[in-house]
Amino acid sequence: MNLDAPYCELSPEVVLDALEAAGHRCDGRVLALNSYENRVYQIGTEEGEPVVAKFYRPGRWSDAAIREEHAFSAELASQEIPVVTPLLQAGESLHAHNGFRYAVFPRRGGRWPELGTTLEREWVGRFLGRIHAVGRAQRFRDRGTLSVAGLGREARDSVLDGNWMPDYLATKYADLTEVLLDEVEAQADSWGGARLGRILGDCHRGNILWTDKGPHFVDLDDCLTGPAIQDLWMLLAGSQQEMRSQLVDLLKGYEQFLTFDRGELALIEPLRALRMIHYSAWLARRWDDPAFPRAFPWFAEPRYWEEHYRALEEQLAAVTGPRLEL
């Protein structure tokens, strides 16, 4: 398999054959869903309800790490927390076909939430408190831990090694990110005082779907060990005052099930900085996958890097500036 273009052999026929091998009688309907890191399809079945198949990116996760993701989701579901868990075939959630590893999920629809009301924010907060309470019961063994080295320094090096930006900007980017990551690392010393646990890892509004019954959480692909604030800060938006108000609502629900350490609020801007650096590195690392140049053509343009540099300058000011306090 070509890991630079890992999905070139994943044809609709292979997808359907894989689903049949996992015990599903398909009716021939295959709809590609919006996903870049993995490939995700909605597949019609003769049983009635469509299912969703996720084909994991080759080379990214070990089998043990994927099974640990599945076990975490099953553990949450056993506590009646609304997460979408993979279907089992002969007791197994992870399958393989033609060199691809995949899992099959029930289709669970919904809309992306606005989180524009106190009720919605408290509702999500309650579930996050319950998720983290379960997450602290044990540790991951085969999945990563959130770190400045992984999300920051290794990501920065990937960008610089790829010669993505003009020479005049590359030196400035290297200097700026060195200062920024030094500052993030200094502030991240407080992570040692944070109680780490199993968390969702990529908890933004796009990974929450809402129905008349409330929210449910999808895609635990990035679950890892980390501080609780990582699953909260991406749900905040707007000015400091607006984010403070939103966080008050989230924590009102959260703390019905688990006490939140206010000291973790100092990690919000450092975590945002890491996400900004890591996002560009993610695109750089995936550029040989043909889906990425098609979806993100602006990434290879100097203008993107100029804007990214300015955003990192502003983020350095945010990291060293006043912290969000309740």
Regions found by a protein language model. Name each.
Residues 1-88, 212-214, 324-326:
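Conserved NTP-binding catalytic cores of kinases and kinase-like/nucleotidyltransferase enzymes
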Residues 3, 163-164, 281-326:
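ATP/Mg2+ or Mg2+-diphosphate-binding catalytic cores
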Residues 34-53, 86, 184-232, 326:
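Active-site acidic catalytic loop and adjacent metal/ATP-binding pocket
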Residues 45-141:
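ATP-binding pocket architecture of kinase catalytic cores
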Residues 58, 102-115, 158-165, 279-298:
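A glycine-centered beta->alpha junction motif in the catalytic cores
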Residues 114-172, 194-196, 295-298:
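A cross-family kinase active-site recognition segment
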Residues 228-259, 275-291:
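Active-site activation/catalytic loop segments of kinase-like enzymes and analogous catalytic loops
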Residues 262-272:
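All-alpha amphipathic helical-bundle segments outside canonical DNA-binding/catalytic cores
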